[in-house]
């Protein structure tokens, strides 16, 4: 004997979708038992030609589909309400709390911020910083003044150029007789 409950569940899921199903593996007596269980569960089912099941009334909601759609619409309604609340109230950020109840404060170790300076200001800073006659104390003072304003600057290494004296060789140097 086949499992009648298996066919009952199968027909509950598929009859609302297809309206008519033929199950060749059921005998007529087993099909009558399946119809009896479906009628007891509230499905309007009719048995035609031995093993063909036809849904009589389409007013019965599909078992799997209706639950999912109802849940989906309920979730949509809840999410719509929550999104309205989020728009109305700004989010409040609270610092994390450890097990002892103290609030954890995390420090930012380093942060890179780029700011736009006018080209004249940047050029002036670089030219003053790279001035060959400028002492290291003044360079350090420039960095400290900028850092006091909250600006961390890393200047390139100062350019020290030594220009060789371009002199015209003397006649004696050119026409040396060694």
UniProtKB/Swiss-Prot annotation:
Domain of life: Viruses
Biased composition (Basic and acidic residues): 73-84
Disordered as annotated region, ranges: 64-103
Protein name as annotated: Uncharacterized protein ORF178
Organism (species): Acidianus filamentous virus 2 (isolate Italy/Pozzuoli)
Higher taxonomy: Viruses, Adnaviria, Zilligvirae, Taleaviricota, Tokiviricetes
